[in-house]
């Protein structure tokens, strides 16, 4: 396969063809069998596969970085692996053997180092996925599964660089429900946000905030990010009560805010009133790390945040996490996994 030329100075957050991907296959007779590295390319599926018909699939997202110590590292891989197990169990996908997730990620990153951007250009995004590939006409779990990891070089999540987001709270849609699959990185959770996001972008907004389906006085999260509200040096974020994704960047923010900045961190219900009266509001996720809210609209009322980003706690927390990821400072948490 001839790989298309990459514009390294204008990567954006897009999928690019790379050299190889990792594959393992599951059957009831042999459990998980490692196929290993294979050329990057299309995957063949039965039209009756459970992933196509019933959405039996999960994914993860992490990054590899070229650091100031002139080495390549991954960030919090064990946490991604643990969440992959949790998502697998919820979606009736046999969990991978212990250690395979981390080993496979490091192997595919190492084989695609030519696609790792330099420190100024970006990072290598890593996307592990698992899905039911066996044919099943009835609504049942597949007997056959595929585990794949592909990688792609990425730049800034935002085309014009980091910016404050104009956001809107949805009272029309819910992202998921308590006791459902909101805590899992199930593919259907994200498909359900496509229409709401399309509608709000047509209105000129950048991001959507979903309310809790059981209590619309409290917030859940954005379409692919957790939410934090800072007020009077107290940092609040919705608790992990079933409908919230246990974001790895979310957990990183909690630990960094407490360890480096002595902020009091509260995990619990966050009301609409608290959201609209915060000093700072920001979103967290692997893709953007942290993105600040510039404004929030709820029921045709818009509030704007007047704290300049360069003067904000949001910026300080974001830069501290990035410093750890790029080994500009010591990692006090044991999050960095070097490529050997």
Please provide the spans of the model-predicted regions.
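Charged, gly/pro-rich active-site loop segments
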Residues: 99, 108-121
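Extended, Lys/Arg-enriched charged tracts that mediate electrostatic binding to polyanionic substrates
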Residues: 117-131
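Helix-start/capping segments and mature chain N-termini
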Residues: 1-108, 129, 136-340
């Amino acid at each position: 396969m001839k790989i298309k030329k990459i514009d390294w100075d204008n990567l954006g957050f897009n999928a690019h063809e790379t050299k190889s991907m990792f594959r393992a296959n599951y059957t009831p007779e042999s459990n998980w069998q490692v196929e290993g590295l294979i050329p990057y390319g299309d995957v063949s599926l039965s039209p009756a596969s459970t992933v196509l018909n019933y959405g039996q699939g999960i994914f993860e997202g992490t990054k590899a970085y070229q650091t100031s110590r002139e080495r390549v590292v991954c960030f919090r891989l064990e946490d991604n692996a643990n969440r992959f197990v949790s998502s697998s169990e919820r979606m009736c996908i046999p969990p991978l053997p212990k250690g395979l997730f981390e080993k496979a990620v490091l192997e595919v990153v190492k084989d695609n180092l030519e696609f790792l951007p330099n420190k100024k250009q970006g990072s290598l995004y890593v996307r592990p996925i698992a899905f039911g590939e066996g044919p099943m006409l009835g609504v049942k779990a597949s007997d056959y599964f595929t585990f794949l990891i592909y990688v792609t070089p990425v730049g800034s999540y935002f085309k014009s660089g980091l910016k404050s987001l104009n956001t809107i709270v949805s009272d029309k849609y819910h992202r998921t429900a308590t006791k459902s699959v909101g805590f899992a990185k199930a593919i259907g959770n994200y498909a359900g946000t496509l229409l709401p996001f399309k509608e709000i972008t047509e209105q000129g907004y950048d991001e959507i905030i979903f309310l809790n389906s059981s209590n619309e006085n409290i917030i859940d999260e954005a379409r692919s990010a957790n939410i934090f509200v800072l007020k009077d040096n107290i940092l609040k974020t919705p608790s992990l009560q079933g409908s919230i994704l246990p974001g790895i960047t979310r957990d990183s923010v909690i630990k960094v805010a407490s360890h480096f900045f002595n902020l009091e961190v509260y995990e619990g219900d966050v009301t609409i009133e608290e959201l609209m009266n915060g000093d700072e509001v920001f979103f967290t996720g692997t893709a953007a790390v942290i993105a600040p809210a510039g404004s929030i609209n709820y029921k045709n009322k818009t509030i704007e945040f007047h704290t300049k980003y360069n003067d904000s706690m949001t910026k300080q927390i974001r830069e501290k996490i990035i410093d750890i990821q790029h080994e500009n400072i010591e990692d006090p948490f044991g999050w960095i996994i070097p490529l050997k």
